[in-house]
């Protein structure tokens, strides 16, 4: 273990050795829930099959193909990469920018995260909306990373406003 002299929450995000790979949580790992209210996708959780269907039939997100079973690696230098697509970008975090009783900080990225499309309820289903570059960090500890973003770009945020959630666990 290297000593980076960083707060524990940062080490939880990027790993004790300066690099950490996150993969999808075991269940309810991508979907919709409420801003300031839900800890994850409480309203709608997409399956791998639904995520794959989105990438197959929605040309705006077909570059995310394969990411429904992929992973994302973050490092101490602020770089991230997504497998299996190989997309790379940079990230910054701010653990002082919180939503009381709901989020522990914010994450900003220069490229889409793992399966980085937001979704919104449309009719009787859900559909991709935009590729967020700023996320609420709803939970970050050694075993969980939960990110959320407004379901639609530019939407007003108020309690229970629709948010897309991404839920990760460390890759073994």
Predicted regions and their residues:
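Short, flexible N-terminal segments of the mature chain
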Residues: 37-55
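N-terminal helix-cap/turn-to-beta initiation motif at the start of protein domains
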Residues: 2-23
